Each structure stands twice: as C-alpha cells, then as structure tokens.
C-alpha cells in the first residue's frame, strides 16, 4: 500500500495510528534506516560540501523551501486546531518513521535518475514527472495509488544496489528535513511535491559530489591520479635524500646505468652479505667502473665494506676467472707473484747446491764438468731474474692500467708455469714477433761457450748435460709467425717466468702427458729465440749431446712399455738427483740417441714405417731420431682416444692409443678379413706366415703334418671341388678324429669347426708346389690354375661353405665324448662316418652350384629362403645367437665404406 492511503486511513481511525506506532517501533529495531527525525542544519553542511560555483543557488533554494514550509504549517494549524493537538503526538513518533521507507525509496530513485540524466537523456525527468503533473486533487485515492505503484515499479530494481551502501550524513539530513516538511503539510499539491523533489535531488547531488571523492580516486579518474602522484614524488625525494653530493658527482662523471641494474646490484649485495656469500665482480669491468658501481646504491661510500673484505673479494674474483675469459686476453703475472717466484727459485737453487755437494761420482771429471755448466746456467738465470724483477713490476703495472685486464690466477710458484702456458693462444692473423733477447736463459736455449761445445767428440756423449740446444722445431717456427699482438708477452714477464720455469719445467720437460703437451708447446713458442736454419754444424753437435737418459727413459724405446709407465711430474729436484746417480753407470759410447719431448711423440712416430737409413727425420717436428730397427711396422692410421669401430686399426692390430679395446668375439674374422684383402691384391705372394688365434707360439709355417693324408694321385673325383674338400678335411684333422673335432667345435670361440687361417696355409702349399719342378701333382695347365685369382676366389668360397656346413651339422648332432680306447670293431663304422661326411659335403656343394647357375636375379632371395627351409639338416634355432654378430659385422662394413668414401673421395 502507498503511504498516502495509509495516512488517510490513519486520520479516520485513531486506533489505527496506535497500531502504526507499534509497527514503526518494531521497524526501528530491525531496520535502522527508519530513524526518528532530528533537527539538522542543512545549510552549513551544504556550504561545506558543495563546490563554490553551486553554493549560491543551493542556499537560495533552501531558503525558499523553508519559507514555503512555514506558511503551510501555519495554515494547517488554523484550519484544524483540535485535531492537530491530538495528531502531533502520533505524527512525531509514527508518521515520519513509517513514511521514511517509501519516500526514501522514491528519493533514492530520484538520486539515480538525476545522476543518470546528466549522461543519458535530458528529457527523462519530464517524462517521469508527467503522471504526477496532472494531479489536482491531493486526496484523490485512485491517482495516489497509481502514482505510488509507478514509483515502486520504477525504483524496485535500483533499490537493491543502494541498500548495502551506507548513506552519507548530508544526504540523510536532507531526507529527514524533507520528511518533516511533508509531515507538516500533507495536503500540498503535486507541483509543490515536484519542487520539493527537485530541491532534494539537488541537495543529494551536491553531497554526493563531496562524498564520492574517494570512490573517484579508486576508480582511476584524473583527480585520483593526480593525488597518487604526490606520494610517489615524496618517495623519490626520500631516496634522493640518502645520496651524498660526493656520490652524485661521481655518478655524473661515469656513464649512467639502468635503474633496474642498480636496484638488483644493491639488493644482491645485501642478500649476499646476510647469507655469508660474496659478490663476484665482472671480468670485463675496470677498476674505475668497479668503484663507481656503488654510486647508485643508497648507502654512503664509507660504509660499503671494509678494506680487508674488498681485498679478499678481489682475490676471489680473480680466482674465479673462467677459462673462456682467460683465452681472450693474455694474462700477466702480478708483481707480488713474481717476487714470490723469485724467492722460491732461490731456495731451490740452494737446495740443489747442497745436495750436489753430498754426491759421490765414480767418474768425477766429466760429471763435474757437466754440473759446472748446469750451475753456471742457473746462476746466470738467477742474475737475470734479479735484474729484470724491478722492470717487470713496472711494466706489468703499467700494462694493467692500460688494458684493465684481470690479474693472473697463479697463487703459488708451482702453478705459475701452468697458468702461463695455458693462456698463450693462437690466432689466425700472421704477425711477426719482436726478437727476444739472446741472453735470457730458458730451457732449450744454448748457454755456455761455443768452444767447449765444439771440443766434444761425436763418438762420445755427455751424460747429464742439461744445457739446452739452439735447435728449433719446424712447427714452432711456423707458429711463432702466427701469433697475434694479444699473445705477445713482454720481456720482463718472460724473465720473471723463467724462475718458476726452471723449477717446475726441469722434470716436466721430458715426461709430459699427451694432454698437457700442447700447452707446453704453446709456451715454448715464445720462449725460444728464432735461430736460422742454416747451421748444420751446430745442430749436428747439439744432436750428439743427450738429454737426461735415465733407465726409465731408456725403456721408452719399446712402444708397449711406454703405455704402462705413469707420469713422473711431481718430483722436481729429486728427479734430477736420481738421474745423476743413474747416469753415472751408463756407458758413454752407446749409439742410441733419442731426442723426443714426450712419450706421446714417440708413440706417434712409431706408427710410421721404418726406413732403410739409420736416421730418420720426423715430418712433424723436424728432429732427427736414431732408433734401432726393432721390427717392421705396419702403416696404420693413428686412432683417437675414444675407440670407434670405424677405425682400420680396430681390425688389424692393437691401437697405439692409451685406451685399448680388446675384441674377442670378432678377432678371427677380423684377422681373416685383413689378410684376405692383402691376399686378393697380391695373388702371387703366398709366402706370408699366418698366425693362428688359438696358439700363442706366434706365426706358423706350413707343415707336412697337415698333409700326411693327402689325396692319392689316382683317386676318382667328379670335379676339382671334391678334391679340394678332401684336402680341407685332411688338413684340418677332422677325418682323423671326427668325434673329437665335434667337441673342440663346441669350445671354439668363432663357432666354426675349421680355423679360417687354414685356408692361407693351403694356398701357400699350392704356391710352393707350383715352383717345384718334380711335383707329382703338376699336370697340364696346373700352373695357370693355381695362379689364377678367379680360381683362388672360388676355392675361398668352397672353404667357407664347407666350414659353415660342418658347423651346422655338428650343432644339429650335438656333442659326443671322444673314445679313449681304440676298438678295432668300430673302425669300419668310423670310416663309414668319414666317407659319409665327405659325400654330404660334396653333394651340398654341387647342389649350391647348380642352383646358382639356374637362379634368376628377381627371385633370388625367395629361392634362397625356400631352399634353406627345404633342407632337412638345417636347424634355425641353433643359429639365433649368431644374428647380433652378423648384424654388427654388416653395420661395421657399411659404416667403414661410407667413411672411406667421405674422407678419401
């Protein structure tokens, strides 16, 4: 029901007013928005909340409304004085609170309509107010009900969204004021009602503008964005306040870095300190960039970190230089590292001199003369180190300031040589290096008078002569020209490294592993002076002087023993003293002269074929080698460390690589394949001895024991294949003891009853029979048949076929124990078995040859499979184990052929 209808009913029935009052009291308990009217000063709040442009209009309208309301209240009191007294008590308590719910709902709809009309349609209020504009009678019940229903329908959807929001104080006060005015004049016209609604809407609109400032700021309007900028500016100013003017000046001088990098750097340093970690500095940053890096951090420079921590951090960052960064720039040893290297070298010299005084020599004259040359060279080296130490420190410091490169990572004199040898890199640009001073004494450099060297006879050798030679390798002469300016080191750095080189490089010079040898060669490329090649006299005299020829190095002549000896690089001075004692017992007239720098080179040179000349010049290193002729070596390709099945060395003989692969399952087949290739290329050279894999006695010559049961001259054979099959069976010994051959077949590695090497022995026998003039087997055309390569290949096929047929037969029949006692009654049965075996082999060979002549290439595979299935003697289950081996053989052959085509074509 509408509010006006309830008002009319309450006027007629006084008891109904009491009931309305009770209901309003209950509404006040459960619905707090129904609060009693309280006098509120609207003008002051409106003036505070409204913007300055709208204050005058709003104040004028409120004054006009208040005047109208007073006039209405006075006229109403004059008309009904008696009823007013009785009604005021009820109206003040019940009517304002009761009528607040529909009017507040209508008022809230007015609020929404006014705010929406500003953006959508200007004529919307006129359309909504036209039904109320035509009301002339205030107490017309029909029109009141229609108007109230229209208002309720129009505001019902909007009422739910605004019930959850708390109404502002200014809007609530304006609503209560309108309620009081409506209670005083319930009989006003519709025009006055519309004017009151417009005034209330203006009040509400003004207060909404004042209240919604926070909501507009949250929604992201321009006013909110402007207000949000101020605290951000204050935060920036606060962060700027931490920076000192000194830091700002330094920051202006250095190039600015991004703000994200500074924030990340400062936060990472704080976290690293809290976790006990250290920050690793960039290798490419200079020292000035490293100091200016702290300009962006909010902390002052004095509180960054103590000097001891900075020093330890710099040392850690130097130690953590990666290998890729070290390969880009040449690394110079630090001045303090050079000082330490010199001091340690002095102690080594003193220790060597002390130990040399305690030694006793059997041949004092020559040994002491050699030791005297050693000590003179060491003293000269020490003097040069002392003289160049000061210059070296100045040059290295100036070089570090120019290039701002990180300091070398060598922390001990023993590691100084390794670091210097690692960083020397090659470059593609050929640049001629500056000539090095001749007086710098380093390994492999001639020190001493040339007259003393010329007095040495060529027939004798100086044992324990460590004076280096003026010779230079070919590869080093070529590689010194191809060094870039980055790899050219200063003279002072070379002289400073000489102290540590003489200590650690003395024992490393002749026993270096293959992995560290290229690094040492890179260091020697710069330490050796460029000597002209046109000095054959000096070089010949230098070749006659030997290195330290200890018994350990004497064994390096044997290539197999070199693979088993470990490197002896850890003993520096002890190895020299041990070599002194051992060399005193070596005869000086020996003709063996070995001059190689490592075992790796000796192994590599052993792969080349031996020449007839006693001396051979190595094509890689340009040095002379005098080696006794041990045995003729086969020309093989050097095999890399990871052994591959594609290498030719894998099949022929053991690899010279330190990693050796021993193949057991394919040893005989590989030996057969290698020998077969040589035999096919040279069909007439059958005089080569063939090794048997089962025997360890070495190669065997063709013996007459294999041919004691040779076929008779007048024997009847249908074809030459039958005769050759009988020769195979007699030479292999299968016919002599068939049962024992079946047992030995089970124990054989290759799973074949006949050794594949027997074929070459048979061919050697045939070749020898051809040369004999009185041979009983020689007839018409026999010589041409034996020397024809086609016949040789045919015999090879027959031999392999017989071997496979025997393997299948023995596998199918199984293993039988040999008879230990010869029974004469069983001899006929034994002979019959042998004859039966021979007939089976001959018939199988004939069948295969007949099928081969009638076969068609298109149906070749199907015919072969069908014939194999029809053969009753074949058992496919027994040959399942050979399938992986066959597949591996085929794959290896295919891959080897492909690699050969790619590499050599």
UniProtKB/Swiss-Prot annotation:
Species name: Arabidopsis thaliana
The protein's assembly and partners: Interacts (via C-terminus) with TON1A and TON1B.
Subcellular location, record wording: Cytoplasm, Cytoskeleton
GO cellular component, one term: cytoskeleton
Residue stretches in coiled coil: none
Keyword Cytoplasm listed: yes
Biased composition regions of type Polar residues, renumbered to the chain: 432-461, 477-487, 501-516
Lineage: Eukaryota, Viridiplantae, Streptophyta, Embryophyta, Tracheophyta
Name of the protein in its database record: Protein LONGIFOLIA 2
Residue stretches of biased makeup (Low complexity): 90-117
Gene Ontology biological process terms from the UniProt entry: regulation of monopolar cell growth; unidimensional cell growth
GO molecular function: microtubule binding
Designated gene of the protein: LNG2
């Amino acid at each position: 029901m509408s509010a006006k209808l309830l008002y009319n009913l309450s006027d007629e029935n006084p008891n109904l007013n009491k009931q309305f009052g009770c209901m309003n009291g209950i509404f006040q308990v459960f619905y707090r928005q129904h609060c009693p009217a309280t006098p509120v000063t609207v003008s002051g709040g409106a003036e505070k909340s409204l913007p300055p442009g709208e204050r005058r209009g709003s104040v004028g309208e409120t004054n006009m409304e208040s005047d109208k309301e007073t006039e209405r209240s006075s006229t109403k009191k004059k008309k009904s004085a008696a009823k007013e007294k009785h009604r005021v008590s009820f109206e003040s308590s019940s009517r304002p609170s009761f009528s607040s719910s529909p009017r507040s709902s209508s008022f809230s709809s007015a609020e929404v309509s006014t705010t929406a009309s500003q953006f959508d349609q200007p004529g919307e209020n006129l359309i909504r107010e036209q039904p109320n504009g035509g009301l002339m009678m205030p107490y017309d019940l029909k029109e009141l009900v229609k108007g109230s229903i229209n208002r309720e329908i129009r505001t019902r959807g909007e009422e739910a969204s605004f019930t959850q929001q708390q109404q502002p104080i200014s809007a609530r006060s304006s609503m209560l004021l309108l309620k009081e005015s409506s209670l005083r004049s319930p009989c006003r016209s519709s025009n006055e009602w519309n004017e009151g609604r417009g005034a209330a809407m203006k009040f509400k609109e003004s207060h909404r503008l004042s209240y919604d400032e926070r909501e507009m700021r949250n929604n992201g309007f321009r006013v909110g964005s402007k207000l949000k900028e101020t605290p951000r500016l204050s935060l920036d100013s606060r962060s700027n306040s931490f920076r000192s003017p000194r830091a700002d000046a330094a920051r202006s001088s250095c190039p600015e870095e991004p703000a994200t990098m500074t924030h990340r750097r400062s936060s990472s340093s704080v976290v690293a300190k809290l976790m006990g970690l250290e920050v690793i500095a960039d290798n490419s940053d200079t020292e000035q960039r490293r100091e200016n890096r702290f300009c962006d951090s909010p902390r002052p420079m004095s509180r960054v970190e103590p000097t001891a921590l900075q020093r330890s951090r710099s040392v850690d960052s130097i130690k953590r230089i990666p290998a890729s960064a070290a390969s880009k720039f040449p690394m110079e040893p630090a001045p303090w590292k050079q000082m330490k290297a010199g001091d340690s070298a002095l102690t080594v010299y003193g220790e060597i001199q002390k130990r040399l005084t305690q030694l006793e020599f059997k041949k004092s004259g020559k040994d002491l003369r050699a030791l005297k040359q050693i000590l003179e060279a060491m003293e000269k080296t020490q003097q040069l180190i002392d003289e160049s130490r000061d210059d070296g420190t100045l040059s290295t410091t100036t070089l570090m300031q120019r290039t701002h490169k990180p300091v070398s990572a060598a922390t001990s004199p023993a590691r100084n040589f390794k670091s210097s040898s690692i960083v020397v890199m090659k470059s593609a640009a050929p640049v001629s290096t500056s000539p090095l001073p001749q007086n710098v004494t380093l390994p492999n450099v001639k020190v001493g008078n040339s007259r003393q060297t010329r007095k040495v006879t060529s027939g004798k050798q100086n044992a324990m002569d460590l004076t280096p030679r003026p010779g230079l390798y070919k590869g080093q002469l070529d590689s010194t020209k191809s060094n870039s300016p980055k790899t050219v080191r200063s003279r002072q750095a070379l002289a400073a490294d000489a102290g540590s080189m003489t200590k650690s490089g003395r024992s490393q010079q002749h026993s270096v592993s293959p992995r560290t040898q290229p690094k040492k060669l890179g260091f020697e490329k710069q330490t050796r002076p460029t000597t002209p090649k046109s000095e054959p006299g000096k070089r010949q005299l230098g070749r006659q002087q030997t290195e330290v020829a200890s018994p350990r190095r004497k064994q390096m002549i044997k290539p197999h023993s070199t693979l088993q000896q470990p490197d002896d690089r850890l003993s520096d001075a002890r190895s020299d003293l041990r070599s002194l004692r051992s060399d005193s017992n070596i005869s000086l007239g020996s003709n063996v002269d070995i001059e190689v720098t490592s075992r790796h080179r000796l192994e590599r040179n052993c792969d080349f074929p031996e020449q007839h000349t006693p001396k051979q010049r190595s094509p890689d290193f340009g040095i002379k080698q005098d080696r006794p002729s041990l045995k003729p070596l086969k020309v093989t390709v050097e095999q890399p460390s990871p052994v591959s099945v594609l290498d030719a060395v894998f099949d022929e003989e053991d690899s010279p690589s330190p990693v050796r692969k021993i193949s057991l399952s394919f040893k005989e087949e590989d030996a057969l394949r290698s020998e077969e290739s040589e035999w096919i290329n040279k069909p007439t050279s059958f005089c080569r001895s063939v090794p048997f894999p089962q025997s360890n006695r070495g190669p065997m010559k063709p013996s007459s024991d294999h041919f004691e049961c040779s076929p008779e001259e007048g024997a009847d054979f249908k074809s030459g294949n039958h005769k050759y099959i009988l020769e195979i069976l007699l030479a292999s010994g299968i016919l002599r003891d068939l049962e024992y051959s079946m047992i030995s077949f089970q124990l054989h590695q290759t799973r074949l009853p006949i050794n594949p090497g027997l074929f070459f022995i048979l061919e050697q026998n045939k070749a020898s029979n051809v040369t004999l003039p009185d041979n009983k087997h020689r007839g018409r055309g026999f010589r041409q048949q034996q020397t024809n390569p086609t016949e040789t290949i045919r015999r090879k096929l027959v031999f392999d076929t017989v071997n496979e047929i025997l393997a299948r037969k023995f596998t199918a029949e199984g293993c039988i124990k040999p008879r230990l006692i010869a029974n004469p009654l069983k001899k006929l049965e034994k002979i019959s078995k042998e004859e039966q075996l021979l007939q089976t082999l001959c018939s199988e060979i004939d069948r295969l040859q007949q099928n081969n002549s009638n076969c068609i290439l298109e149906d070749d595979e199907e015919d072969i499979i069908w014939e194999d299935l029809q053969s009753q003697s074949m058992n496919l289950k027994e040959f399942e184990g050979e399938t992986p081996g066959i597949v591996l053989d085929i794959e290896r052959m295919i891959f080897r052929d492909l690699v050969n085509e790619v590499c050599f074509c």
